[in-house]
Amino acid sequence: KWYIPWSLRYWLFKCGGEATLNSYSSKEKFYEYIEYLKSLPHYIEYQDYKTKDNRYLVVSHSTVGKVWNIRNSTNENDVEEFNHFVKWSRWKNHDNEEIFNVYGHTIFQEALLNEYSCGIDLGCFYKNKERLPNPRLCALEFPSMKIYTQESLED
């Protein structure tokens, strides 16, 4: 029997996780990948890559929003709030003046590009064409801000 941490159950039952689980050859391989994913950073800063208005690039799973200013805090509550927000937040963009944030997690019909961020999740994995008629893979070329999309090659 699979042990699924509580934090992954929404993913399992609402976001296609069951199909993902079934694609693994063994439970051990699945748990190995979970440990690998848990070891990854919540965001990556590219301070040498800048926009025309001198914002440096930050790539994150979800938008960093208003919690960006607490990313280096040593306060346990701040750390927990930041990590949770960067993994799970939706619709809470914020202009953190020194950065340009590229993120996913929230599915859009088209890339959501503004002067301080770009949401690039166009739901490539999504199978329900009634709810999302045009799921695609999306990439942002930085700092030109050119957007590339590719339809899913899977059925």
Specify the residue positions occupied by each region the protein language model found.
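Acidic, His/Gly-enriched loop-helix segments that form or flank divalent-metal centers
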Residues: 2-135, 142-153
